[in-house]
């Protein structure tokens, strides 16, 4: 086997096309997209992206809606904390 790419990673398929900064942005997204994530139900690192915004756990077969490239987004975390705060205010 020959030595593979070190810097460009998954964006090596683009060659010299599209510019380095665009390839760098694409690399960041594609690495997040193809990574495995922890399942919030069973706790195993088996959640993979099925389609845009759909994440499937291979272990417990749960399907979760999330972000396009990651399971949870910053906006989703903000919404969760806001809902939690409003719920606490309503109970008090």
Curated annotation (Swiss-Prot):
Keywords: Cytoplasm, Ribonucleoprotein, Ribosomal protein, Zinc. InterPro entries: Ribosomal_eL37/eL43, Ribosomal_eL43, Ribosomal_protein_eL43, Ribosomal_zn-bd. Its cofactor is Zn(2+). Pfam families: Ribosomal_L37ae. Signal peptide: none annotated. SUPFAM superfamilies: Zn-binding ribosomal proteins. GO terms for molecular function: structural constituent of ribosome. GO terms for cellular component: cytosolic large ribosomal subunit. It is found in: Cytoplasm. Zn(2+) binds at residues 39, 42, 57, 60. GO terms for biological process: translation. Component of the ribosome, a large ribonucleoprotein complex responsible for the synthesis of proteins in the cell. The small ribosomal subunit (SSU) binds messenger RNAs (mRNAs) and translates the encoded message by selecting cognate aminoacyl-transfer RNA (tRNA) molecules. The large subunit (LSU) contains the ribosomal catalytic site termed the peptidyl transferase center (PTC), which catalyzes the formation of peptide bonds, thereby polymerizing the amino acids delivered by tRNAs into a polypeptide chain. Component of the large ribosomal subunit. Mature ribosomes consist of a small (40S) and a large (60S) subunit. The 40S subunit contains 32 different proteins and 1 molecule of RNA (18S). The 60S subunit contains 45 different proteins and 3 molecules of RNA (25S, 5.8S and 5S). Belongs to the eukaryotic ribosomal protein eL43 family. This is Large ribosomal subunit protein eL43. The lineage of its organism: Eukaryota, Fungi, Dikarya, Ascomycota, Saccharomycotina.
